[in-house]
Amino acid sequence: MKYRSMENRFCMSLVAFAVIARLLLATGVSAALDSAVGLAPKPETPDEPDVFLLEILEPERMPDEPPAQPQAPDEPDESPEPEAEPVEAPLMFSADEADAISIAGACSYRPDKQALLTRPSALSIPEDGPAVLIVHTHSSEAYTMEAGFEYPESDALRTLDERYSVIRVGDEIADILTEAGISVLHDTQPNDYPNYNGAYERMRQTIEEYLAEYPSIRMVLDVHRDAAEDADGNPVALTAEVNGEACAELMLVVGTDEGGLTHPDWQENLANALKVQALLNRAAPGLCRNLDLRTERFNQHETPGSLLVEVGASGNTLAEALRAARIFGQALAVFLRGQMSTKGS
């Protein structure tokens, strides 16, 4: 089985994250993610995490506070009091944020967005072992070519070259999550070539193999590229401007049981998707399309943390998709960090 494992590199304490989470809630995520939309080369020291998530704020001593005095050597040692367990600041969402998210799609269900968005997530991210599995049901999906981004096509707007397909987009998301201290597995094996039909069934088997080998996995993220055409059949780009840069639009897709297949946790998946989209709306208003609620399952019944994201469309460039992927990865990292370890694994 071919896959890419992103080793977990925790770079901050829970106490630090609590402080930063409160700052993010107070000031909004938008300023914190400004750096996520550029296409500058990755730093030579990838172990250095993104500042907005992992910067450690050390407490300062008041100017007139005397320095701590050393203990006299003849005083008996006293057992220190046990330190209190750090408490992470919970992510909070408002009714207005629920109203700002439009749900579309073929599904006839009308879920209560406010109730789902504002209730605590049941997702619990473990500290040990891979927590997120990134997959690509349609692994050969690619983007409109531009100078410097040419690739050999396996079919129209498809390629087996991982550097130019949605697998490259998955790499970007995996890097962001790993830098945030979230352990990731990235499945990069071809899944829709040479036969496009049956891709979801093949991916279901792959997901179940991963879940059996890595029971710590809590979220399965299926990364796609959407297809959009004009009346003449030409690819259409779906773009949003974020901090002066063109980004591919994002669409979160959530499956249900309306098609008749068993899917008991679809509302939990939807609740998590709403939270991620609310964080994206804070960071980059206008980047997300309507949340797509569907009658199909899309293999999301495998875990209550499943999510499908469409990063751009066939008319977008890879550069636009990578900018969007970085913003998505940052928002997803904030959400997942909020579900870490205080609930157990």
Task: Label the model's feature ranges.
Residues 139-142, 190-194, 225-230, 257-260, ...:
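Solvent-exposed loop/turn segments at secondary-structure junctions
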Residues 10-218, 227-233, 326, 336-344:
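N-terminal catalytic or cofactor-binding beta/alpha core of small enzyme domains
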Residues 265-292:
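Active-site-adjacent substrate-binding region
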Residues 133-136, 184-186, 219-222, 251-254, ...:
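Structural recognition of the beta-strand scaffold that forms the well-ordered cores
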Residues 205-207, 232-240, 291-297:
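Alpha-helical scaffolding within the catalytic cores
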Residues 152-156, 228-264:
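A short, glycine/acidic-enriched catalytic loop
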Residues 170-174, 204-208, 270-273, 277, ...:
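Extracytoplasmic/secreted envelope proteins and their assembly/folding machinery
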Residues 286-345:
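Active-site-adjacent mobile loop/cap segments within catalytic or ligand-binding domains
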